[in-house]
Design a protein with these regions (language model features):
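Conserved thiamine diphosphate
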Residues: 6, 135-187
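Flexible, low-complexity linker and terminal segments
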Residues: 1-5, 201-269
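Short catalytic-loop micro-motif centered on adjacent basic/acidic residues
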Residues: 19-21, 92-94, 169-174, 196
Length: 269
């Protein structure tokens, strides 16, 4: 990570981070910082909110306003922060378990409301911090601590779920596609409405080891070979490929603006 990005955006006394060697979350954290840096946003106008899990430890490293909340509830806290302080750029960092399991209900209703919050989902297909249990995004037939023979569940597609629930900007990048991930994050932050950017990440400690994926480098190569650049969310699914691109970008009434109009109307009665 370039020194100018580190020095300007992170709490140096909190580094080094806690993530395992080869974990992709540090790369995704860098893409968020780089996006904010390139947009030249006033750091005092940024608020990073996270829940619980490996990904959610990221909030403590950023040198902005940060809130480390409870499991699955980051979007609830973020909604309150945004409504009370509509001028803030509120960015939620969450994981696949935090966002789609215990926090799944909050995710779909945040999408439905179209509140101006950017949500970055660090998706490593497993619960890393609690011991390698399978998550709602773990692929069918993959193994995990709680699926020692194989996972029989079908996984959520975070982007399809978010788009269907009403998010007005939906994109997916990966730890290999760093430039694209930075670009998608910048577009999400500047978008007026609820934005979801899924970042495909790597967990060599649990997901890689349980599924015999090899080293951290092998996992990175696997992500590279599994992804295709396309704005068609369904392209490559029949061949077990993952689309990397912007799948939805529409303009619809934003929640805090509608709320403010409602307050004005109520006060005029």
């Amino acid at each position: 990570m370039p020194s100018e990005v580190v020095n300007g955006n992170f709490r140096l006394d909190r580094l080094p981070h806690i993530w395992c060697p080869g974990c992709g979350h540090g790369i995704l954290m860098h893409t968020v910082a780089k996006a904010i840096d390139e947009l030249e946003i006033d750091k005092d106008k940024v608020c990073i909110v996270s829940g619980i899990g490996c990904s959610s430890r990221a909030s403590g490293y950023f040198n902005y306003n940060t809130v480390h909340t409870t499991h699955g509830r980051a979007l609830s806290f973020a909604t309150g922060i945004k409504i009370a302080n509509p001028e803030l750029k509120v960015i939620v960092i969450t994981g696949d378990g935090d966002a789609t399991a215990i926090g799944g209900n909050h995710l779909i209703h945040s999408c439905r409301r179209n509140i101006d919050i950017t949500t970055i989902v660090f998706n490593n297909n497993i619960y890393g911090m609690t011991g390698g249990q399978y998550s709602p995004t773990t692929n069918t037939d993959d193994k995990a601590t709680t699926a020692p023979y194989r996972n029989i569940d079908k996984p959520f597609d975070v982007c399809s779920l978010s788009a269907a629930a009403g998010a007005t900007f939906v994109a997916r990048g990966s730890v290999y596609h760093v430039k694209q991930m930075i670009n998608y994050t910048k577009r999400a932050i500047t978008h007026k409405g609820f934005s979801v950017v899924e970042g495909i990440s790597s967990c060599p400690t649990y997901y890689g080891r349980k599924n015999k994926k090899g080293s951290a480098v092998d996992l990175m190569k696997d992500i590279k070979n599994s992804c295709i650049l396309s704005d068609d969310i369904n392209k490559g699914k029949d061949d077990n490929k993952i689309s990397i691109g912007v799948f939805k970008d529409v303009s619809l009434p934003e929640y805090t603006k509608e709320y403010q109009r409602l307050v004005v109307k109520a006060n005029s009665k």
